[in-house]
Design a protein with these regions (language model features):
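Catalytic nucleophile-loop/oxyanion-hole region of alpha/beta-hydrolase
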Residues: 38-74, 240-245
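Short, surface-exposed "cap/lid" segments of acyl-processing enzymes
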Residues: 9-38, 42
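Alpha/beta-hydrolase-fold enzymes
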Residues: 81-168, 172
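Catalytic active-site module of serine/aspartate enzymes centered on a nucleophile-bearing elbow/loop
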Residues: 228-288
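A short loop-to-beta-strand scaffold at the N-terminal edge of the catalytic core in hydrolase folds
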Residues: 1-9
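Catalytic histidine neighborhood in serine/cysteine hydrolases
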Residues: 211, 215-233
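Short beta-strand/loop motif that positions the catalytic acidic residue
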Residues: 190, 196-198, 202
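Short alpha-helix in the alpha/beta-hydrolase fold that links the catalytic acid
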Residues: 192, 206-215
Length: 288
């Protein structure tokens, strides 16, 4: 199995590391990776056999980068949109104290009722999942039309060979439904600092559950912003003016977190150095 990864590095020393988790059917185009069956990674396009395995792939890749010598002292942030938001929450659940903060854009804490089939259909399709898991027969509206507000962006997504546009495969839909139900039941376990953004007119993931996440999470540092009139894809599918608002809020939040986080790190390093003393021979000794 080959998984496509990419990174963007600034010319100057970065304040911290940001890891991006893309949404269902999308690709990575900072540090990022395409999930199995997505973008430029290998595997059946649009097929998620095991969501836990997908999260483990991300965890191992991101953790490996964080633990490199040149990155070991840098702040670590994860950012995810839609299904990527669910990946972010599960990465946090895997290692609750590892990440310094998260940015969640319309996270998949619950699939909106407008997209989800009725319970009778779900029960029937769940049984079929064991027999024909890769079949594309889930009766859902066109997600591209629901997610992206701008017609030009919809065309761009439809024209990309790396973005999956077909109906959800049975096993994929089952995995997404199962994971979203699990996350919805365990919102109170979220403990890291986070910025949570959601469009008020989102028809793909439920804005009311994002509000519930903000209320239930035990995080002492949490911010929720609901953008009236905006759709599901906040990072790519909105008007230029709306996209500017969203990324301005993200940049402001990151600047605040890196400023306080790096100041704390400097104090810790200074405290450690204060305990060291150089003797007459030039050797550094620890002062008890």
């Amino acid at each position: 199995m080959k998984l496509f990864t990419c990174r963007w590095l600034p010319s100057s020393e970065p304040k911290g590391l940001i890891f991006l988790c893309h949404g269902y059917g999308m690709e990575c185009s900072i540090f990022m990776k395409d999930y199995e069956g997505h973008g430029k990674s290998s595997g059946l396009q649009g097929y998620i056999k095991d969501f836990d395995a997908l999260v483990t792939d991300c965890s191992e890749h991101f953790t490996g980068i964080c633990e490199r010598k040149e990155n070991s002292k840098k702040l670590r942030f994860i950012m995810g949109e839609s299904m990527g938001g669910a990946v972010v929450l599960l990465l946090h659940r895997k290692k609750p104290a590892f990440w310094d903060g998260a940015i969640l854009l319309a996270p998949m804490c619950k699939i909106a009722d407008d997209v989800k089939p009725n319970q009778f259909v779900i029960s029937a399709l769940t049984k079929l999942t064991r027999i024909i898991p890769t079949w594309k027969i889930i009766p859902t509206p066109d997600i591209v039309d629901l997610a992206f507000r701008e017609p030009a962006v919809r065309k761009e997504v439809r024209d990309s060979p790396y973005c999956y546009k077909g109906r959800p495969r049975l096993q994929t839909a089952y995995q997404l439904l199962t994971i979203s139900l699990d996350i919805e039941k365990r919102l109170q376990e979220v403990s890291l600092p986070f910025l949570l953004l959601h469009g008020g007119d989102d028809k793909v993931t439920d804005p009311s559950v994002s509000k519930l996440l903000h209320e239930k999470a035990i995080s002492s540092d949490k911010t929720f912003k609901l953008y009236p009139g905006m759709w599901h894809s906040l990072s790519r599918g909105e008007t230029a003016e709306n996209t500017e608002i969203v990324f301005s809020d993200i940049t402001k939040w990151l600047d605040e977190k890196t400023a306080t986080g790096n100041a704390k790190l400097e104090r810790e390093l200074k405290s450690g150095n204060d305990a060291l003393h150089t003797d007459s021979s030039g050797k550094t000794i620890l002062v008890e």
